[in-house]
Amino acid sequence: SDYRRSGYDRGHLAPAADMRFSPEAMRDCFYYSNIVPQHPRLNRGIWLTLENRTRQWAKEYGAIFITTGPVYSSGDTTIGNNQVRVPAAFYKVLLDYRSRPPKAAGFLFPNTDEGPGTLAGHMVPVDAVEAATGIDFFAALPDSVEALLEGSVNPASWLSGEGETHEPQ
């Protein structure tokens, strides 16, 4: 009921489309611990495009590490009687550790009616996502490898160049 008439979708952090491997996983992905208020144009647009591409990359590369979450700020609003906090933005961090050399990418998306944009336009170094979230994503890696992976991003190593845009239906 917190989401009803709030203007926000129930955005899944781990997409339901990724949970088809198990009825239990599919059921679990609908718990509110996996759901956050997400602007409809973001959720049904470029965020969906990124979810689909992430699935493709996982198949193409054999395995990738994926971390997804909200970015909160001091000015966040809330919705509903339970005062569900509305994130200012969302992130996704990817690591393909099997490629030589390994590669990583961060994505940051404002939780607004920004429009479709491109995946390349939202791709940032992992360091930028760490600055926005306060999370050290690759802390277990040797510092030299961590610095190499987090300090820059090469969109051409991830994106095929077909624009990677999506206008919501």
Where are these regions (language model features)?
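Domain-level detector of nuclease and nuclease-like folds
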Residues: 1-169
